[in-house]
Regions:
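Active-site loop/oxyanion-hole signature of alpha/beta-hydrolase fold enzymes
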Residues: 91, 96-131
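Short beta-strand/loop motif that positions the catalytic acidic residue
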Residues: 244, 250-252
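Conserved alpha/beta-hydrolase "acid-adjacent" motif
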Residues: 257-263
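Hydrophobic, aromatic-rich cap/lid helix
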Residues: 212-237
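Conserved HGGG/HGGXW glycine-rich cap/lid loop of the alpha/beta-hydrolase fold
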Residues: 49, 54-101
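Flexible "cap/lid" loop of the alpha/beta hydrolase fold
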Residues: 147, 156-184
Length: 303
């Protein structure tokens, strides 16, 4: 395993006036191309309940799995649109959020159960071997998916997440208390303290969704249980990272307030052949601080 460290500083200019990352190099002002803000929320019945999702773009499929405490409306539109320029992108709500069915009784949710529902979504939408990008808790779900349903995944991008081998550096005690803070403070927690502009731009970006919503307090509590069980090594799928055979990219920020950089390294060393890339001076939402650069990394990796 070799780690690449990418110097990174936030560039707020590409977010101004609603410019999307897809046109950073070409210049702002283009109204053509995929637009997640106009993609309707759809509901599909799966073998594991209903799932609310959006899809846009065309090309090889790319499934985005959002983190804990988030809905699919926590993916900034510019980020999704940029990926959809070359892919059929699917974003969706995890179990118990929005129009997605719960998959367990309160307090007994597991990462593997959410991966099972994600697998059911892939089957219901007839996605052919999608690349899967999971952020934070979504990266844990992506790992479990690759372990339990390897034939469904072509490539794995694990962003700001942790292994489930039982060796992970624990989350800080304040992690789940963040969800009780104001939206402004929640956004700030995703970035280093010297990146206030990034936090403001993130909050502005997700504010473009007309009917923004998030999970209930009960769902967040269930997710907390699932994440802590995973990181402690109590979820069977998490202990099988060594069996992941799909090409895997692990990425993280060196200034992440939640997921220690040591976890990025541990995860990359646990998955055979995994590549590791670290973004310098970047927080939990490193993929947003310099979206254009991260998207180029993703596009190169997916091929």
């Amino acid at each position: 395993m070799r780690a690449w460290v990418v110097p990174m500083r936030f560039r707020v200019s590409w977010m101004l006036a609603g410019c999307c990352a897809a046109v950073v190099l070409a210049g702002c002002g283009s109204s053509s191309g995929p637009d997640v803000l106009t993609a309707p929320i759809q509901v599909v019945r799966t073998t594991d309940g209903t799932v609310g999702y959006r899809e846009l773009g065309s090309g090889p499929p790319l499934l985005l799995i959002v983190g804990g405490g988030d809905s699919m409306d926590d993916w900034p539109p510019s980020f999704v649109d940029a990926l959809a320029a070359h892919h059929k992108v699917v974003v969706f709500d995890n179990a118990g959020i929005g129009r997605t069915s719960a998959v367990s009784a309160p307090g007994s949710l597991s990462i593997t159960a959410m991966a099972r529902q994600t697998s059911a979504l892939i089957s219901a939408l007839r996605l052919r071997h999608p690349a899967v990008l999971g952020w934070s808790m979504g990266g844990m779900i992506a790992q479990a998916l690759a372990v339990t349903h390897p034939a469904q995944v072509s490539r794995l991008i694990l962003a700001a997440t942790a292994p489930g081998t039982g060796k992970a550096v624990p989350l800080p005690a304040y992690t789940f208390s963040v969800f009780s803070l104001s939206s402004k403070k929640q956004a700030a927690s995703l970035f280093p303290k010297n990146q206030a502009a990034a936090a403001g731009a993130f909050l502005s970006a997700v504010g473009h969704y007309q009917s923004y919503y998030g999970p209930s307090a009960a769902t967040i509590h269930s997710q907390k249980h699932a994440v802590l069980q995973w990181m402690a090594g109590h979820d069977a799928a998490g202990r099988l990272a060594g069996e992941i055979r799909v090409p895997t990219l692990v990425a993280g920020g060196t200034a992440d307030h939640f997921i220690a950089t040591a976890n990025d390294r541990l995860l990359a060393s646990s998955v055979p052949g995994a590549k590791l890339i670290l973004f310098d001076d970047a927080g939990h939402a490193f993929w947003f601080q310099d979206a254009a650069k991260f998207i180029r990394v993703v596009e190169t990796f997916i091929g």
